[in-house]
Amino acid sequence: MPGARDALCHQALQLLAELCARGALEHDSCQDFIYHLRDRARPRLRDPDISVSLLTLVVTACGLALFGVSLFVSWKLCWVPWRERGLFSGSKDNNQEPLNYTDTETNEQENSEDFLDPPTPCPDSSMKISHTSPDIPLSTQPGGQENCAHAVRVQRQVTEPTPSARHNSIRRQLNLSNPDFNIQQLQRQEQLTGIGRIKPELYKQRSLDNDDGRRSNSKACGKLNFILKYDCDLEQLIVKIHKAVNLPAKDFSGTSDPYVKIYLLPDRKTKHQTKVHRKTLNPVFDEVFLFPVHYNDLEARKLHFSVYDFDRFSRHDLIGQVVVDHFFDLADFPRECILWKDIEYVTNDNVDLGELMFSLCYLPTAGRLTITIIKARNLKAMDITGASDPYVKVSLMCDGRRLKKRKTSTKRNTLNPVYNEAIVFDVPPESIDQIHLSIAVMDYDRVGHNEVIGVCQVGNEAERLGRDHWSEMLSYPRKPIAHWHSLMEKR
């Protein structure tokens, strides 16, 4: 049956071909028939054949990859250790050869002389390329000089292997015992051995220098120019403040209103101050100040300059300070000497004036505010003797006006006084938010006027700890709240 069907199909195709050739059928139908015959004549791959061919390619690629990996692993595991073992055994055999230390020393001296001095004709003796290689005889034929020059160049390019500790000790003994020991040779050896070494001390020094440079730049607040001179007849230290340059800007306008306070420490009673120069970063003062002091006492005294920025509506800003001591080490002193000093950056907190401890207690029903001055510590010395006579003055302030003031007793000749004295103010509850306390530690002076050692404030208008202490007192009425307060300079 299939054979008869194929025969019928073949006859039908022939019949259609004859009809197309005679033109009995349409041209388009004949073209479609011809294209159909061509498509049937092309060999077609079945889907199972395509999948089998792709699977064969994938399996072949995986096999090649596994073969490459196995070759690489076998090379790493077998070939590299075998080669290193062969090299190590060869070098070990070479190191076991006997060394002629006398010849080595002689040849080393010849090499050093040849390296430092101009080239000389080649000797007839043998030349050593290294400590472990045998002697190579040199030919003495007519072209010997050219061969020698070439050999010398080759010798200089060869790196000498590192000698053992025993070799170094024996060679050192030979060098010391040799009467012709050359210092230049030893220096050259040290230079050659030092090439390529890392010296941590050089990097450490450089880093320290860089740190010092950054530190000095970060603390620089300009420079102060002044003149010092001592008048032996009047026994006075003459200080002339000439000018300041490159001061930092403290105002929003990009300028400052600078002035300078001067002390001859440890005496803070004698204080001088320059005029305020408005809106400038390079003020010219040209003011002279006198400090009566004995010449022999200058060694224990320090000249202290404090540069401030004047502010009409708030506390003055401390720009920086300059401290001059060891007057006898200054050039041309006691004659006139001109000095330029960097103004060191300090904050108000860095000015160590001491601390004061007191407690606050408020009774709302009675309208009574009690401040108990307990003690102070590490106060700044205001007298030449290195001590002070401190007492505490408390002022009740409202809108910048002083309503009342009280003070404690004076403690003589101490920097750590203990008071335990209570001061009471009558303040009604409706006015407690409008007032604040100003506390000043004073130094009593029997002859002159009393000096302020330092001040602090508590209240809603105070800063940081002063405001926190006041808020804590109001939060816990009828309970004494004690804190230490750092003293600040009075503005």
Swiss-Prot record:
Primary residence: membrane
KW Cytoplasm (keyword) present: no
Residues the entry annotates as binding Ca(2+) 3: D311, S314, D317
Binding site for Ca(2+) 2: D251, D309, D311, D317
Residues involved in Ca(2+) 1 binding: D251, D257, D309, F310, D311
Region (Disordered) residue spans: 91-147
CDD domains (alphabetical): C2B_Synaptotagmin-3-5-6-9-10 (cd08403)
Binding of Ca(2+) 4, residues: D383, D389, D443, D445
Ranges where the record places region Cysteine motif: 9-31
Biased composition (Acidic residues): 105-116
Cofactors named for this entry: Ca(2+)
Disulfide bonds: none
PROSITE patterns found in the cross-reference section: C2 (PS50004)
Transmembrane region(s): 53-73
Assembly behavior: Homodimer; disulfide-linked via the cysteine motif. Can also form heterodimers with SYT3, SYT6, SYT7 and SYT10. Interacts with DNAJC5 and SNAP25, but not with HSC70. The interaction with DNAJC5 is stimulated tenfold in presence of calcium while the interaction with SNAP25 is inhibited.
Protein family according to the UniProt entry: Belongs to the synaptotagmin family.
UniProt protein name: Synaptotagmin-9
Species of provenance: Mus musculus
Gene name of the encoded protein: Syt9
